[in-house]
Amino acid sequence: MIDGDRYVMAPLTASRSVCEAFHPDRSHACIKEYSDDAAYPSYRYDDGLYPLGFYHFHHLFAGHNVERSAWHMRVANVVILLILIGAITVLSQREVRVNIALAALVAWTPMGMYFIASNNPSSWAITGVFCYGAALYAGLKARGWRHWALLGVACLSALLCYESRGDASFYVFVASLGILILEARRRHLPEIGVATVLSAIGVWLMLGSGQASSASQSSDATITVHDRIDVAFTNLRYLPDYFAGFVGLNSGPGWRDTSLPGYAPVVALLVLGFVIFLGARAMSWRKALASIMVFGAMAGIPILVATPTAFPNLGAYHARYTLPLLGVLLLIWVSSAVKKSSLTKGQFTFFVFFLSVVNAVAMHTTIARYVRGLLWIPHIGWIAPVNLNGDIQWWWADMSLSPMTLWGLASLGYTLALTSAIYLLRHRQVEAPVSSTPTEEEEPA
């Protein structure tokens, strides 16, 4: 205890790991002033505000070298995503694979990928919510042992949600409701039962989480109902800007202190708009109702939560808190639209090019932010130096590649992976279409 506040002793490099925060012109070189051998009181510790699983799991990778430990934790988070997405891809039908790939790429480029590979609980929240929705969606369409295997993947994904954030636990309920409205039929009673149990667990964990308790205990009698209504209307007007934060607009990497060039979020929004129009090619009352329900949660939760005294307004409520639901919404929205699509090679080319540009620019800016800091240009704002190797002030100790080389290889790898995925998905033999006339067992539940 120090002056009545509880602290824990942590390595100095961990306590000062964000020494450049809110100073875009500073690189991460400031961490060199501190040592792994020295300890310092830190107020950032497990006080019950977040679920135990995420931090207890990552504690397994904590070692004397803080930088190496952070590397191991990031790699573990990416591996978890690859295992879950890989399992869903292998077990699902071709049409489902296309929908899942499209929804994930658009929802996660660029900010989702940044958070998934981070040391933040949002990594598990984004991975868990989307993989849960995708596995449940694929499971409802699968048959035989693949069907049960996908339900198992859904359970594992829900576990990630439970152990990451309280709101992610609640998102299991939102995703379940959306996917079941879209696809559930009478023959899906076992799946409905599993989803209901997982959703009930999620709601129960959310209500008992430290985040919910903290929000409820932060009420202040001086905040009147009129004040809360005013803030709610302000939040409603700010909602489009908040949604644009999903692609990095005013809500970039770091602690929202790394501004992406304006054209990156704009291009990402163009791609998102393209997918919205693509999904509108095929509509049904189920799809409309499921989309409205998930979108309502994405809009309603931030508006209601981001009020005094928990938050001054929606501007203080990070977009990453709601980002996990974007992938589920897009998955619902593009369902039954991809197979009806008649996209040309030119349209696919623009899709790959635009996403590749967004990914490359976001990576370049983020690397520059920590390697040498951003440059302030009057009347323009913060920009990243073009040459990442020009003034290397900090870089990963065990990284043999230079910043520029790593950026080039990662950007090229993203483009090649995206191109290959589209080629394979387009040229695989199309499965025999299912009759559009519902049988008795396919009637709505």
Question: Where are the regions a protein language model picked out?
Answer:
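Membrane-lumen/periplasm interface segments of multi-pass, membrane-embedded glycan/lipid transferases
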Residues: 57, 206-280, 388-411
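Transmembrane-helix motifs of polytopic, lipid-linked glycan transferases
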Residues: 72-96
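Transmembrane helical bundles and short interhelical boundary loops of multi-pass, membrane-embedded
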Residues: 182-185, 203, 215-228, 347-445
